[in-house]
């Protein structure tokens, strides 16, 4: 079965995602679409607005199979996020990766990716890093086509292309142009399409404008948001107060002694936004700092990093997805495709299970990896 992979967060799923899924299948001539989706925490360093099980139900209105991107990858920068996602795609025997982009020019994106790859492998690049220059500054100063690198989707697209070139060069790639909205738009300005940011803003402010920009058949799933970033603060504060700086230094992307800044400012903050204003620094982006805080919340340490894919968690599927899963199990009998958690898979998925428990602890949700079977959509 010819397959196309979509690397996603669906936070939440909307008409733009449905368009992307439809165009991905059409342009790749694929029989099946597979979403590699972040779980309960997302790349911007926040909990997802709805839990992964509800977002899987939403996603199955547009794709055939949904698998979980591990938490450590979901809370990583674009390069590692992309690298791990492409490894998952390769594990799933995906033929084509289709990603959203602000430009409909795959050759231009591939050219930028090739130039960055060459730069990263040069001794000059290593010298600049040793001199204390940031990766972002080096790329900004030495890569010509900066217009490509001004938008989040293009940056991720370039990261996917780089990862495919290094991990699975046989995977094809397609760029699907975004429709009518910018990634960070906070308002719904179009009759049919809106960014995830704008939809979250509408949901949080109890505005009904989101109802026009999500698929009609899943509107009923958009209930009160499950969890907001601000609700995590007291749990993060407890974790920082109860650990030493030495313990915090082992958190996955903690670096440059940032743990001391976290410790010295935590007593003076009573909410998430105030704390962020106290600890922000030119050394790190706002999003990077938020990811570090979520890694503290989930206790994801450097020792949790694993370069290998040892199994993939299946969250949901329709009939075509079930057929593809049968194909995978027959074609790759030694690979682990987890539909229900048992002793072996629980050890493998410990960070994802923990992330769900913590998400539920804060939000009051009940669905977890043990009491929620794989979601089957019988309509599509």
Swiss-Prot record:
Keywords: ATP-binding, Cytoplasm, Ligase, Nucleotide-binding, RNA-binding, tRNA processing, tRNA-binding. GO terms for molecular function: ATP binding; ligase activity, forming carbon-nitrogen bonds; tRNA binding. Coiled coil: none annotated. HAMAP family: TmcAL. It catalyses: cytidine(34) in elongator tRNA(Met) + acetate + ATP = N(4)-acetylcytidine(34) in elongator tRNA(Met) + AMP + diphosphate. InterPro entries: Rossmann-like_a/b/a_fold (IPR014729), tRNA(Met)_cyd_acetate_ligase (IPR008513). Catalyzes the formation of N(4)-acetylcytidine (ac(4)C) at the wobble position of elongator tRNA(Met), using acetate and ATP as substrates. First activates an acetate ion to form acetyladenylate (Ac-AMP) and then transfers the acetyl group to tRNA to form ac(4)C34. Its main location: cytoplasm. One of its GO terms (biological process) is tRNA modification. NCBIfam families: PRK13670.1. This is tRNA(Met) cytidine acetate ligase. The keyword Transmembrane helix does not apply. It holds the Pfam family HIGH_NTase1. Belongs to the TmcAL family. Gene3D superfamilies: HUPs. GO terms for cellular component: cytoplasm. It is found in: Cytoplasm.
